[in-house]
Amino acid sequence: MKAIIPKYNEEGSKIIGKQEVEVIGQVKYIGDTDPLSFVDGKIYNVIEVIGNSIRVIDVIEDYLYMFDDPTINWKGINGKFIVVNDFTEEKLLEKLQNKFKNNK
């Protein structure tokens, strides 16, 4: 599965075109709705796993969030991601989800 996101210059300050990226999975956001960022029940495409964080696409932009607490810095907004589809052979998203499930 592919998605199109903006391509930025080296400094990351200006959009210089578009780029096609591979979608490696999908997560559902469960929690408080913030109209500018998250909607309860919405499914987001994941394009990268970086440590304990995932890069998700929201409409056309991509954002990096901590998997276990994506709303950590937002006052009054609480939520989490649940893996809906993991397209990776290594099941990277499922392993990340299980890592936090086992720690609670």
Regions found by a protein language model. Give the residues of each.
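Mixed-charge, Lys/Arg-rich low-complexity intrinsically disordered regions
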Residues: 1-32
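Intrinsically disordered, low-complexity regions
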Residues: 1-2, 13, 18, 54, ...
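Basic/aromatic-rich interaction segments and small domains that mediate binding to polyanionic partners
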Residues: 2, 26-74
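Mixed-charge, low-complexity intrinsically disordered regions
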Residues: 10-11, 98-104
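Glutamate identity and glutamate-enriched acidic tracts
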Residues: 10-11, 19-22, 48, 61, ...
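Short glycine-aromatic motifs
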Residues: 13, 21, 27, 44, ...
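Exposed, low-complexity/repetitive linear segments and helix-based recognition motifs
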Residues: 17-19, 45, 55, 59, ...
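Intrinsically disordered, low-complexity, charged/polar segments
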Residues: 63-100
